C-alpha cells in the first residue's frame, strides 16, 4: 500500500520554521504531555500511550488500555502533576468492545511505564460524540477536564429542568471541586495563561460560531441557548444556573473551523509572542495567533473587520493565521525547551516550531528504525483510521447521530 502524502506545514513568519519532529503514530494521536524531556502521547484508536524519548518514538507503549473509539471516543486526554499521570478515555472490556464508561484514571510514572491504575472519576456513558477530552494542570497543580454535552440536555445545558450530570462542564478532577464552568457544547482545548493563571478554552459550535473563551471560575458558556456573540433575546432565555455568569466569547468564527488545542508561549525563543495565544483547528489545518490585550482578558486586532471579535463569513483571516497545512491538529504545547509542539491527528505526526536562528544547532530528525516500523504498521490500518478521522472531524462541528 502506498503511504499517504501530506502537504508540509507552512508558517507566515519567516523567522520560524516547522520541523517534523516525530512521525509514525499509527492510530490517531490526540494529545500529549511533557515529563521532563520525555513526551507521553495518546493514540485514540488503540488505547496506547506512546513514549517519545530523545526525539525517538519508542516501539513499546508505556500503557495499553482497552478502549472503544467509535465516534469521538477513545484515548482522549492527559495531564501530569509530578509523577502522577491523569488519563481520560472511553473504557471497554476489550479493544473495540462496547463502551463501559468514560473514565479518568491516575497512574504513577516510573520513567518506563504507567503503573498503579486508580479510578478518579466515572462519567456518564451515553452517546459517542461530544465527549470533550482536553485536560490541563493549572499553576496551583489542580487538574481540570472539559466534557461536552454528550447529547444530553438539562440544567447544565441551560435548560430549566434536568439534573446536573457532569456534562457540558469543566470539571476540577484533582482535588475534586464544584463545576468550574458550564454550558459548553463540546471542546477539545484547554490552556492556562502562565501570567494570570486563568483558564481558556475552545468550543465547537453547531452550524456556526465556534469560540475561544476566557473560562474563569463559575463561567456559563451559554449552550444550548447561545453560541457566538449573544443578543438580547438569547440572554433573556438563559435560565440563570445559580452562581454562574455568562459572557460573550473572546473570539468567534461564524463559519465553523473546529478549533481544538490552544496554548500560550512564555519563552525566550518566542520572545515576540509572549503576549499571544496560539490556537489550532481540525477542519482547515490552520494555526492561529491572537494578540492579547494589556489585561490579558481579550484580544486586539489591527483589521477593523475583526474589532467585533468575530470572523464573519467572507472576512479575511490573514491577520490571525500564523501557519497552515497541519491537518486535523488536536494539541499544541510549549515544550521544556521553550519551543512549540503540535500533534496532528490526521498526519500521525508531532511537529515542532523553532526559530530559524536555532536550526543550525543539533536538532534530531527522527527517521529511526522504530519509527519506520511504526509506519509499516500504520499502512496496514490507514483505511480504517482515515474513516474514523473523518467522523471525528465532522462530529466536532455538528451532531451526527451514530449509525
Question: Which residues does each PLM region occupy?
Answer:
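Short, conserved clusters of charged catalytic residues that mark active-site
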Residues: 24-27, 182, 324
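Short intrinsically disordered, low-complexity coil segments enriched in acidic
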Residues: 1-6, 87, 151, 181, ...
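Acidic, Gly/Ser/Thr-rich repeat motifs that build Ca2+-stabilized beta-propeller blades
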Residues: 6-149, 189-192, 197-205, 255-297, ...
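Intrinsic disorder/low-complexity signature
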Residues: 113, 146, 155, 159, ...
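Secretory targeting signatures
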Residues: 1-8, 359-403
Amino acid at each position: 500500500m502506498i503511504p499517504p502524502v501530506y502537504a508540509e506545514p507552512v508558517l507566515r513568519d519567516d523567522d520560524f520554521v516547522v520541523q517534523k519532529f516525530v512521525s509514525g503514530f499509527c492510530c490517531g494521536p490526540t494529545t500529549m504531555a511533557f515529563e521532563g524531556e520525555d513526551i507521553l502521547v495518546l493514540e485514540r484508536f488503540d488505547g496506547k500511550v506512546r513514549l517519545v524519548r530523545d526525539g525517538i518514538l519508542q516501539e513499546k507503549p508505556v500503557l495499553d488500555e482497552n478502549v472503544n473509539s467509535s465516534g469521538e471516543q477513545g484515548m482522549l486526554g492527559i495531564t501530569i502533576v509530578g509523577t502522577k499521570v491523569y488519563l481520560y478515555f472511553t473504557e471497554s472490556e476489550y479493544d473495540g468492545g462496547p463502551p463501559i464508561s468514560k473514565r479518568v484514571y491516575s497512574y504513577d510514572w516510573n520513567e518506563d511505564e504507567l503503573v498503579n491504575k486508580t479510578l478518579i472519576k466515572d462519567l456518564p456513558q451515553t452517546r459517542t460524540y461530544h465527549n470533550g477530552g482536553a485536560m490541563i494542570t493549572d499553576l496551583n497543580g489542580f487538574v481540570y477536564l472539559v466534557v461536552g454535552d454528550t447529547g444530553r440536555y438539562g440544567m447544565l445545558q441551560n435548560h430549566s429542568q434536568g439534573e446536573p450530570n457532569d456534562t457540558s462542564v469543566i470539571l476540577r478532577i484533582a482535588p475534586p471541586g464544584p463545576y468550574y464552568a458550564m454550558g459548553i457544547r463540546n471542546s477539545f482545548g484547554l490552556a492556562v495563561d502562565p501570567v494570570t493563571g486563568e483558564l481558556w478554552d475552545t468550543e465547537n459550535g453547531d452550524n456556526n460560531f465556534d469560540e475561544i473563551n476566557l473560562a474563569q471560575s463559575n463561567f456559563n458558556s451559554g449552550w444550548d441557548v447561545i453560541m457566538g456573540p449573544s443578543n438580547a433575546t438569547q440572554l433573556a432565555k438563559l435560565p440563570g444556573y445559580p452562581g454562574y455568569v455568562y459572557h460573550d466569547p473572546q473570539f468567534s468564527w461564524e463559519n465553523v473551523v473546529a478549533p481544538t488545542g490552544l496554548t500560550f508561549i512564555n519563552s525566550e525563543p518566542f520572545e515576540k509572542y509572549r503576549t499571544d495565544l496560539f490556537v489550532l483547528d481540525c477542519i482547515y489545518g490552520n494555526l492561529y495567533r491572537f494578540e492579547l490585550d494589556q489585561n490579558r482578558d481579550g484580544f486586539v486586532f489591527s483589521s477593523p473587520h475583526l474589532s467585533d471579535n468575530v470572523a464573519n463569513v467572507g472576512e479575511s483571516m490573514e491577520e490571525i493565521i500564523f501557519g497552515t497545512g497541519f491537518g486535523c491538529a488536536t494539541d499544541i504545547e510549549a515544550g521544556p525547551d521553550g519551543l512549540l509542539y503540535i500533534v496532528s491527528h490526521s498526519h500521525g505526526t508531532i511537529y515542532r516550531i523553532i526559530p530559524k536562528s536555532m536550526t543550525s544547532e543539533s536538532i534530531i530528525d527522527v527517521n529511526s528504525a522504530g519509527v519506520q516500523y511504526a509506519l509499516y504498521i500504520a499502512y496496514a490500518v490507514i483505511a480504517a483510521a482515515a474513516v474514523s478521522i473523518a467522523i471525528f472531524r465532522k462530529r466536532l462541528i455538528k451532531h451526527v447521530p451514530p449509525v
